[in-house]
């Protein structure tokens, strides 16, 4: 009886050995179904994989989307606007980006400090 399985399966998935029954091929073994728990909880590993897939999908969809996104909001009174009104966003900061060199920034901050001191006198 070399390399031969001698067992039979119960419906609940527990294996029980029998002395008289010998099975030699996989096709003769009855298929059993694995029942998942009905409590609605996913396996922790599956959940992590799902989260990872969602993150990858979002990142690969448009990698420049977050960088180029403009931040704006509307006042609460504008939320119920009629169709003939235009929805013009309110942009935070100026629309044209301003870049200063280090020297310009230092001069600007010094000028602000000087102006504050003049006002306090």
From Swiss-Prot:
Region (Disordered) residue spans: 20-98
Origin: domain of life: Viruses
Compositional bias segments (type: Basic and acidic residues): 35-51
Protein name as annotated: Uncharacterized protein 285L
Provenance organism: Invertebrate iridescent virus 6
